[in-house]
C-alpha cells in the first residue's frame, strides 16, 4: 500500500437542510431554524471549533454559496486556523456543480475561490493550501473526473500567468467522485479503474489513494430504501476488493442523514450505523445530527463515531451473495416504483408546504437540475422523506414489505445476514405509523392500500407493534391525522414543523 502523507477525515459536517430545531450557534434568542448562506461561514467554524468535525462540505451544487468563505474564516478566526490549519488538520471540501446535470454557472467561481485561497494561505505563511480536493456529485464516468481536473489545471495556469505575480498556483485538484445511483455504486470499481488509467496517462503519475463518496439519500429516493442499502453495502464490499487488487488505499465516504431511510446516522444510533456500513471511513453528520440533540450528546457521539470509523473493517461477500443481493435490489425497486407512482400526486401539497432551512436555488428551470423518478418531478430527498413521515407512512416501508415477502429462503438468509438491524429498525419505524392518517389517505386513493400491505407484510415477518409507544409519538400520530385532512398551506407547514421537532429530524 502507498504511504499517505495526510490526515483522512472521519467526520464530515454538511449543509443538508434536515434539522428540525434551531442550530446551537445561533444563540438562545433565535427561534428560527433557517440558516442563510451568509451564516454558513459561522456554521463551518462552529463545526470545527465546537463540534470538532474533521471536515466540512461547502456546497456549490444547486444552492447559493459564499465565495468569501476562506477570506472570512481566516480574517475572523485567524488564531484558531493558525493552530488548526485548513488542508492539514481541518478540511473544507467543495461540492462542485455537475455541469452535465445543471448549468455550471458557479463552477468557475468555485475553482477561482480554491486558487485565491491558496494565495491567501501563502500570504499568511500557512504551509498547506487550504482547498485541494473537490466532490463531483452524480458522477457517471471517469472522463467526467478528468475533465474537471483539466478545467482546473487550465484555470490555474491562466491565473498564474495573468493575475499572480511572483508565485504560481498549484495546477491540480484531487477528485472525490460521488456515486448516487445503484448502478454507478455497483460499478464504481470499473469507473475507478478507468479513472486511474486516464490519470496516469494524463499526469505520468499514479494516485497514492482515493476517497470515494456513496450517496444514501438520493439512491433511496430513486429506488427505495431496500435497494439503497443493498447498493451501499455492495459498493463498500466491492471497493474493498478493488483496493486489495490495486494495492491502493480507498477511503469510502457515505452521505447519510438521521432518518433510517437516508442511512440512519443519528447521535443515538452510532453502534447501529457502524454495523450497517462496514468498511466506511468518513461519515456525514448532517444538520439534524448536529442541531436536534443536546450539544454534549452530539459532541460525545462524534467522538464515538470517529473512533468507530477508524477501526471499521470491511465485510467480504461471496460472488453468490453479491448476485443474490443484486436480484433482491431489483425486486425491491420494482415494488417501490409500482406503489410510488400512484401516490406521488397525493403528496404534492405536502411537498409544497414543507419548511425550508437553506438558501437553495429553485429546483426547476435553468438554474437547478430536477430529479425525476418514472417521469415524475421529485422533490429533494429530505422533503420527500419528511413528507411521508408527516403523513404517518415512513417511506422505508414503501415496497419493502412486499419485496421481503417475495424472497425465497436463500435470498432472505443472505439479505438478513447483511442487514443485521432489520428487525430493530422496523420495530422503531412502526412507532411513526399513523393508522388514522393512513386510513384517510386510503379513503381518498385506494393505491395507499399497497403501502398498508407493505406494513402488514413486514409486521407478519418481523412481529412488531404498530403505532406510538410514548407521548411524543402519540402527538406525532395525531398531527399526521390532522395534516392529511386540512387544506390550508400555512397550517400544513406549522404541523410539519411540530412533527419534525417531536422526531428530532425534519426529513
UniProtKB/Swiss-Prot annotation:
**Top-level class of the enzyme under EC nomenclature:** lyase
- List membrane-spanning regions: none
Q: Which GO terms describe its molecular function?
A: magnesium ion binding; phosphoenolpyruvate carboxylase activity
Q: Does the keyword Magnesium apply?
A: yes
Supply the alphabetized keyword list. Carbon dioxide fixation, Lyase, Magnesium
Cofactors (names): Mg(2+)
Pfam families, A to Z: PEPcase_2 (PF14010)
Q: What is its EC number?
A: 4.1.1.31
Entry keyword Glycoprotein: no
- Organism domain of life: Bacteria
Q: Name one GO biological process term.
A: tricarboxylic acid cycle
Reactions that this protein is recorded to catalyse: oxaloacetate + phosphate = phosphoenolpyruvate + hydrogencarbonate
Q: Where is this region: Disordered?
A: 1-25
Protein family membership = Belongs to the PEPCase type 2 family.
Q: How does it assemble?
A: Homotetramer.
Report the function annotation for this chain: Catalyzes the irreversible beta-carboxylation of phosphoenolpyruvate (PEP) to form oxaloacetate (OAA), a four-carbon dicarboxylic acid source for the tricarboxylic acid cycle.
Show the NCBIfam families listed in the entry. PEPCase_arch (TIGR02751)
Designated name of the protein: Phosphoenolpyruvate carboxylase
Q: Tell me what gene encodes this.
A: ppcA
Amino acid at each position: 500500500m502507498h504511504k499517505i502523507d495526510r490526515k483522512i477525515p472521519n467526520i464530515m459536517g454538511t449543509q443538508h437542510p434536515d434539522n428540525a430545531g434551531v442550530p446551537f450557534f445561533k444563540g438562545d434568542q433565535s427561534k428560527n431554524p433557517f440558516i442563510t448562506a451568509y451564516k454558513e461561514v459561522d456554521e463551518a467554524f462552529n463545526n470545527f471549533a465546537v463540534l470538532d468535525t474533521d471536515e466540512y462540505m461547502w456546497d456549490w451544487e444547486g444552492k447559493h454559496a459564499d465565495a468569501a468563505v476562506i477570506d472570512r474564516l481566516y480574517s475572523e478566526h485567524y488564531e484558531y486556523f493558525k493552530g488548526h490549519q485548513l488542508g492539514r488538520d481541518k478540511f473544507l471540501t467543495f461540492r462542485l456543480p455537475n455541469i452535465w446535470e445543471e448549468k455550471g454557472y458557479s463552477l468557475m467561481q468555485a475553482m477561482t475561490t480554491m486558487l485565491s485561497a491558496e494565495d491567501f494561505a501563502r500570504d499568511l505563511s500557512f504551509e498547506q493550501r487550504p482547498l485541494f480536493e473537490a466532490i463531483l456529485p452524480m458522477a457517471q464516468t471517469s472522463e467526467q473526473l478528468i475533465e474537471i481536473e483539466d478545467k482546473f489545471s487550465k484555470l490555474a495556469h491562466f491565473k498564474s500567468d495573468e493575475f499572480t505575480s511572483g508565485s504560481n498556483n498549484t495546477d491540480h485538484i484531487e477528485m472525490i467522485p460521488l456515486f448516487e445511483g445503484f448502478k454507478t455504486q455497483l460499478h464504481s470499481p470499473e469507473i475507478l479503474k478507468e479513472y486511474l488509467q486516464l490519470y496516469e496517462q494524463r499526469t505520468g503519475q499514479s494516485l497514492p489513494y482515493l476517497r470515494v463518496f456513496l450517496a444514501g439519500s438520493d439512491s433511496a429516493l430513486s429506488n427505495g430504501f431496500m435497494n439503497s442499502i443493498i447498493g451501499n453495502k455492495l459498493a463498500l464490499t466491492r471497493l474493498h476488493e478493488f483496493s486489495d487488487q490495486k494495492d491502493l488505499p480507498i477511503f469510502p465516504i457515505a452521505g447519510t442523514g438521521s432518518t433510517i431511510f437516508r442511512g440512519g446516522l443519528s447521535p443515538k444510533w452510532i453502534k447501529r450505523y457502524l454495523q450497517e456500513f462496514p468498511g466506511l471511513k468518513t461519515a456525514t453528520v448532517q444538520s439534524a445530527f448536529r442541531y436536534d440533540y443536546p450539544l454534549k450528546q452530539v459532541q460525545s457521539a462524534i467522538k464515538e463515531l470517529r473512533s468507530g470509523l477508524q477501526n471499521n473493517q470491511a465485510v467480504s461477500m461471496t460472488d453468490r451473495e453479491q448476485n443474490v443481493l443484486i436480484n433482491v435490489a431489483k425486486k425491491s425497486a420494482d415494488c417501490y416504483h409500482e406503489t410510488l407512482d400512484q401516490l406521488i400526486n397525493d403528496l404534492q401539497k405536502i411537498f409544497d408546504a414543507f419548511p425550508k432551512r437553506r438558501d437553495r436555488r429553485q429546483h426547476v428551470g435553468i438554474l437547478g437540475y430536477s430529479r425525476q423518478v418514472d417521469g415524475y418531478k421529485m422533490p429533494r430527498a429530505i422533503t420527500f422523506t419528511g413528507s411521508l413521515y408527516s403523513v404517518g407512512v415512513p417511506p422505508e416501508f414503501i415496497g419493502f414489505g412486499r419485496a421481503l415477502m417475495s424472497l425465497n429462503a436463500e435470498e432472505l438468509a443472505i439479505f438478513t445476514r447483511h442487514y443485521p438491524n432489520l428487525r430493530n429498525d422496523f420495530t422503531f419505524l412502526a412507532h411513526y405509523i399513523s393508522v388514522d392518517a393512513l386510513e384517510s389517505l386510503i379513503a381518498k386513493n385506494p393505491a395507499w392500500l399497497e403501502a398498508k400491505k407493505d406494513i402488514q407484510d413486514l409486521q407478519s415477518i418481523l412481529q412488531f407493534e404498530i403505532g406510538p409507544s410514548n407521548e411524543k409519538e402519540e402527538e406525532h400520530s395525531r398531527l399526521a391525522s390532522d395534516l392529511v385532512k386540512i387544506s390550508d398551506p400555512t397550517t400544513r407547514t406549522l404541523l410539519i414543523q411540530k412533527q419534525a421537532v417531536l422526531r428530532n429530524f425534519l426529513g
